[in-house]
């Protein structure tokens, strides 16, 4: 707390919920600081006006509520999907990719309002504290960062509720007890963790899933869609061009209705522990499959394999919070270069939790009917050439075998 004694003005990442409302009041009462709130519309599906009204009720004069959905998808989600990024083989990084955007706006607002600190509501056990703070320091190395969950004296939900009552912070009746699990959501995904999900041997209750119907309840008839790409980014569905956020929202609807995008994962957190999360990424799951399909006919083999080699490192950088690091930007430049000719359309069949590629076409396709046909290729490929190719590639293996067979 001593390091905060000179803080006069703080920009708080504010959701309007109980926890960040308590943080807001704590900053006012314990630090005596003026608080500025920032609430981002990331497509989480919540009304944001209540956050404004609650901030006003708590005496806040400077309130920022910004619709960042297009920026989120255009500048963060789409660049990540150009890389086909997944953490530990399956996680589409829906929470991770939103944190640098929030930090960017916190820093921008701090500069605009003359604040000397920012604050967030991430706990001291999770990855988000790292992501928020690494991003903030990358953009302003001198900013002060306040993380109340690491500093305050509250030990339980009861302590928080008592503080709320003492300071007349409204508490909804359904918030009086501990929530059965915690939720984070944005336009790309929703994640649920904790409480009823902490035993990884037990199936998650169906009520945890808020973005998708169960695959068993999905329609018995498949849905077929076409996704169009330009320079590696999705630009259209069924021939209709859309903005990035509008397109992702539309894919979410297709995924939701067909039970697509559920993931039950035990992951390795950056801070060292394992955690179990239940994720729903309906549109992102469709997008990843479609992007890999269009790359399959437009990327050269060497470029495709190099991308696959660097992808785990790129995904790890995002998961750990290094979006604004030079190494992520270097990898991004390589990835973006690879996408110059990644354009065309992919036809997908969506059915009971599955995304199946049934067609792909591109004016920049490297797929040659003449080369792969089982019929007469009219001299496009001389099969006799394969003998020399194989013999040269076998040279080291034959040399090794001769040595090893000597007794």
UniProtKB/Swiss-Prot annotation:
PANTHER family on file: ARGININOSUCCINATE SYNTHASE
The protein's matches in HAMAP family, at most eight in alphabetical order, are given as:
Arg_succ_synth_type1 (MF_00005)
Q: What is its EC number?
A: 6.3.4.5
Residue positions binding L-citrulline: 91, 96, 127, 131, 182, 191, 267, 279
Gene3D superfamilies in the record = Argininosuccinate synthetase, chain A, domain 2, HUPs, Single helix bin
- Which UniProt key words apply to this protein? Amino-acid biosynthesis, Arginine biosynthesis, ATP-binding, Cytoplasm, Ligase, Nucleotide-binding
Q: Which CDD domains has this protein been placed in?
A: ASS (cd01999)
On whether ATP-binding is a keyword of this UniProt record, the answer is: yes
Which pathway is recorded for this entry? Amino-acid biosynthesis; L-arginine biosynthesis; L-arginine from L-ornithine and carbamoyl phosphate: step 2/3
Kind of enzyme, top EC level?
Answer: ligase
- What catalytic reaction does the record list? L-citrulline + L-aspartate + ATP = 2-(N(omega)-L-arginino)succinate + AMP + diphosphate + H(+)
Gene Ontology cellular component annotations, sorted alphabetically: cytoplasm
Q: Pfam families per the record?
A: Arginosuc_syn_C, Arginosuc_synth
Q: Which family does it belong to?
A: Belongs to the argininosuccinate synthase family. Type 1 subfamily.
Protein residues bound to ATP: 13-21, 40, 121
Q: Provide one Gene Ontology biological process annotation.
A: L-arginine biosynthetic process
Look up keyword Nucleotide-binding and say if it applies: yes
Q: What organism is the protein native to?
A: Rhizobium johnstonii (strain DSM 114642 / LMG 32736 / 3841)
Quote the protein name from its UniProt record. Answer: Argininosuccinate synthase 2
* Binding-site residues, L-aspartate: 123, 127-128
Quote one Gene Ontology molecular function term: ATP binding
Q: Where in the cell is it found?
A: Cytoplasm
State how it assembles: Homotetramer.
């Amino acid at each position: 707390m001593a390091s905060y004694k000179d803080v006069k003005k703080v920009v708080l990442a504010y959701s309007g919920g109980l926890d960040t409302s308590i943080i807001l009041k704590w900053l006012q009462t314990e630090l005596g600081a003026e608080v500025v709130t920032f609430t981002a519309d990331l497509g989480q599906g919540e009304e944001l006006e209540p956050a404004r009204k609650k901030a006003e009720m708590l005496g806040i004069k400077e309130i920022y509520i910004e619709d960042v959905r297009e920026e989120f998808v255009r500048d963060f989600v789409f660049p990540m999907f150009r890389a086909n990024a997944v953490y530990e083989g399956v996680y589409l990084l829906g929470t991770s990719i939103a944190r640098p955007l929030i930090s960017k706006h916190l820093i921008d607002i701090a500069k605009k309002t003359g604040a000397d600190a920012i604050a967030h509501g991430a706990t001291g056990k999770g990855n988000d504290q790292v992501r928020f703070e690494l991003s903030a320091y990358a953009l302003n190395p001198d900013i002060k960062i306040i993380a109340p969950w690491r500093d305050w004296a509250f030990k339980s939900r009861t302590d928080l509720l008592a503080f709320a009552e003492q300071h007349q912070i409204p508490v909804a009746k359904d918030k009086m007890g501990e929530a059965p699990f915690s939720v984070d959501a944005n336009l790309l995904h929703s994640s649920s963790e904790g409480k009823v999900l902490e035993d990884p041997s037990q199936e998650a209750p169906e009520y945890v899933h808020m973005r998708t119907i169960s695959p068993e309840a999905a329609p018995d008839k498949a849905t077929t869609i076409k996704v169009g790409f330009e320079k590696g980014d999705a630009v259209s569905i069924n021939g209709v061009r859309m903005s990035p956020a509008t397109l992702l929202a539309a894919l979410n609807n297709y995924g939701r209705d067909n039970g697509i995008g559920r993931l039950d994962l035990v992951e390795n957190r950056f801070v060292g522990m394992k955690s179990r999360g239940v994720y729903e990424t309906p549109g992102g799951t469709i997008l990843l499959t479609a992007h890999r399909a269009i790359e399959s006919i437009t990327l050269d083999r060497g470029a495709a394999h190099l991308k696959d080699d660097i992808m785990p490192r790129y995904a790890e950088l995002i998961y750990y919070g290094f979006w604004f690091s030079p190494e992520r930007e270097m990898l991004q430049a390589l990835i973006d270069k690879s996408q110059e000719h990644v354009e065309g359309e992919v036809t997908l069949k969506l059915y009971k939790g599955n995304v199946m590629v049934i067609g792909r076409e591109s004016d920049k396709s490297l797929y040659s009917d003449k080369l792969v046909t089982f019929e007469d290729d009219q001299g496009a490929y001389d099969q006799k050439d394969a003998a020399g190719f194989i013999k040269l590639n076998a040279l080291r293996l034959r040399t090794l075998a001769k040595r090893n067979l000597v007794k």
